[in-house]
C-alpha cells in the first residue's frame, strides 16, 4: 500500500448531479424537471398543504380541544424527589428554592412514586391518597 494507490472504497463517494450540462448527462436541457408546469419554473413551488385550489384537509377538518392555562401553574411532584431534600418541613417556597418546580407554579400535588426515605412534614400542598398513606406510615404529617 502506497500513498499514490489509496482510493476511496467503491460506492462510498458519489458524484453530484450536474444539471443542464448536455444531453449525454441525462440531466441536460430540462435538468430533470420535465416539460412546462409550475414545478418546472424557477421559484415555482406550491405551499405545504396546497391541494390545487381544493379546500385543503387541514381546513376541512374542524378544530378541537384547547390548551389549559391551568397547566402552567400546577405541577405534580414525586415523593421520591421530595425525600431527597435536606429539610423536613416542605412547602411551596422550599420546592421553588430547591428547583424542583418552576417559579410560576402555584399549586402542587405530591404523588406516590418511588421510596420515601425520611419522615416529612408537608405544609399547604395537595397529596394523593397513596402518598398520604406512605407519609403517615413513615411518621410524617400533612398540615393545611
Curated annotation (Swiss-Prot):
One of the GO biological process terms: translation
Region (Disordered): 1-51
Alphabetic keyword roster: Ribonucleoprotein, Ribosomal protein, RNA-binding, rRNA-binding
Function: Binds to the 23S rRNA.
Family: Belongs to the universal ribosomal protein uL15 family.
Assembly notes: Part of the 50S ribosomal subunit.
Protein name (Swiss-Prot/TrEMBL): Large ribosomal subunit protein uL15
Origin species: Buchnera aphidicola subsp. Schizaphis graminum (strain Sg)
Lineage start: Bacteria, Pseudomonadati, Pseudomonadota, Gammaproteobacteria, Enterobacterales
Amino acid at each position: 500500500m502506497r500513498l499514490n494507490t489509496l482510493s476511496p472504497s467503491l460506492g462510498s463517494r458519489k458524484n453530484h448531479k450536474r444539471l443542464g450540462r448536455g444531453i449525454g448527462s441525462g440531466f441536460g436541457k430540462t435538468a430533470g424537471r420535465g416539460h412546462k408546469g409550475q414545478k418546472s419554473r424557477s421559484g415555482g413551488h406550491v405551499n405545504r398543504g396546497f391541494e390545487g385550489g381544493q379546500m385543503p384537509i387541514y381546513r376541512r377538518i374542524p378544530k378541537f380541544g384547547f390548551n389549559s392555562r391551568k397547566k402552567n401553574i400546577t405541577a405534580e411532584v414525586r415523593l421520591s424527589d421530595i425525600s431527597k431534600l435536606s429539610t423536613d418541613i416542605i412547602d411551596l417556597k422550599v420546592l421553588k428554592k430547591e428547583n424542583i418546580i418552576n417559579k410560576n407554579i402555584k399549586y402542587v400535588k405530591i404523588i406516590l412514586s418511588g421510596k420515601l426515605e425520611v419522615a416529612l412534614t408537608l405544609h399547604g400542598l395537595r397529596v394523593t391518597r397513596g402518598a398520604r398513606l406512605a407519609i403517615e406510615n413513615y411518621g410524617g404529617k400533612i398540615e393545611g
